[in-house]
């Protein structure tokens, strides 16, 4: 069975990329157990708590990231350097319990995946 990586690179609520990526991730998890999720670049903002998308008339899908462990999606990673660049290095509470790892480690992990989807 193929290993599939989902990479979130965009800010939440600015476009449909994050929501569509999450929908694809949940659908794919029903077909395979070998799924990894990576939050890099502006994608690290996807996991910030207390977002208020209703103020810009957007759907609040962020809380759905909390259910990933229920779908047996346990390989979730945040890029350490991207958190620092966005002033989030001291944030220790995200909506998903993702491991904070260096960019180099993310690159090393991605090599093990057969398919990489970017949102």
From Swiss-Prot:
It is found in: Cytoplasm. Its main location: cytoplasm. Gene3D superfamilies: DsrEFH-like. GO terms for cellular component: cytoplasm. InterPro entries: DsrEFH-like, Sulphur_relay_DsrE/F-like, Sulphur_relay_TusC, Sulphur_relay_TusC/DsrF. Keywords: Cytoplasm, tRNA processing. One of its GO terms (biological process) is tRNA processing. Heterohexamer, formed by a dimer of trimers. The hexameric TusBCD complex contains 2 copies each of TusB, TusC and TusD. The TusBCD complex interacts with TusE. NCBIfam families: PRK00211.1, sulf_tusC_dsrF. Belongs to the DsrF/TusC family. Part of a sulfur-relay system required for 2-thiolation of 5-methylaminomethyl-2-thiouridine (mnm(5)s(2)U) at tRNA wobble positions. PANTHER family: PROTEIN TUSC. This is Protein TusC.
């Amino acid at each position: 069975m193929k290993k599939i990586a989902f990479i979130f690179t965009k800010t939440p609520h600015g476009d449909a990329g994050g929501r569509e990526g999450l929908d694809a991730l949940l659908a794919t998890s029903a077909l395979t157990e070998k799924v990894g999720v990576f939050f890099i670049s502006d994608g690290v903002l996807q996991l910030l708590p207390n977002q208020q998308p209703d103020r810009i008339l957007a759907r609040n899908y962020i809380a759905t990231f909390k259910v990933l462990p229920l779908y047996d999606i346990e390989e979730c990673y945040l890029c350490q350097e991207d958190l620092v660049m966005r002033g989030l290095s001291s944030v220790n509470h995200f909506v998903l319990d993702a491991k904070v790892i260096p960019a180099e480690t993310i690159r090393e992990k991605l090599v093990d995946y057969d398919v990489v989807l970017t949102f």
